[in-house]
From Swiss-Prot:
Species in which this protein is naturally found: Haemophilus influenzae (strain ATCC 51907 / DSM 11121 / KW20 / Rd)
UniProt cross-references to InterPro entries, sorted A to Z: AceGlu_kinase-like_sf (IPR036393), Asp/Glu/Uridylate_kinase (IPR001048), Carb_kinase (IPR003964)
Protein name as it appears in the record: Carbamate kinase
GO cellular component, one term: cytosol
EC supergroup of this enzyme: transferase
Subunit structure: Homodimer.
E.C. no: 2.7.2.2
NCBIfam families reported for this sequence: arcC (TIGR00746), PRK12352.1 (NF009007), PRK12354.1 (NF009008)
GO molecular-function term, one example from the UniProt record: carbamate kinase activity
Disulphide bonds in the chain: none
The organism's taxonomic lineage, starting at the top: Bacteria, Pseudomonadati, Pseudomonadota, Gammaproteobacteria, Pasteurellales
Major location (coarse): cytoplasm
Amino acid sequence: MRIVIALGGNALLRRGEPMTAENQRQNVRIACEQIAKIWPNNELVIAHGNGPQVGLLALQGAAYTDVPTYPLDVLGAETAGMIGYMIQQELGNLVPFEVPFATLLSQVEVDINDPAFKNPTKPIGPVYTKEEAERLAKEKNWSIAQDGDKYRRVVPSPLPKRIFEIRPVKWLLEKGSIVICAGGGGIPTYYDEHHNLQGVEAVIDKDLCSALLAENLDADLFIIATDVSATFVDWGKPNQKAISVASPEAISELGFASGSMGPKVQAAINFAKQTGKDAVIGSLSDIVDIVKGKAGTRITKKTEGISYYA
């Protein structure tokens, strides 16, 4: 079975945790221990987020004032290399030595006229108090937004249109490789007036890009791995309920928040609608049961309405 796994940012760095290389590697190791359990008899493609990492690089770059800060597309490429290296190494230590790995930088086409460029919504970097965020917004001309009980920098997040490296990914899978790609939603690019490909200052949502990746690869299963066991209605309330199975149409009517579960649900809907195959949102720690169809929230065209866990 060909499986595309979208690793949430929590798999690399837990909320509020210091953004050290040691912490990130430890979290990657924990994630890879789960992924290794489903490697036998499956083809694996791993995508991942990069919000905290790209924000950290932007902060580090801003601290060195002798040169202009590097643009977000370049920082995205840097994080894809760093995180891909960690996943490749840690997962490689858990599967047989002869299993090949490859991390591919993935350029993703976006529409330069996407409305997202005028409405930044994608959180990147560390969390701040309201006072810290307001000060940084003024100093650095950032857009900021609330993220839970804290605040973060937000940047444009245009929709992914095309993944340019999709053919090399297919070639690697055909040769038995585990592939890490579309890191951080891929590197946002567009064609200029001379039809030259250029990078652009943005961060693509990794779940939406991963859904496009899974669709392009004819994946049998698309897993969005996060830090909760399922998608919930009335989250955080005494009457919260975990969704077991839902049709794309039914779950789309629930209106999940754009800054949290919303993009994950939309990505799962996109994949299920386009392919007729299943997408599952669930905890990385449940990934074995997710593959067996026993855990997570499964979004599928094979059902009508919504079913909940007892």
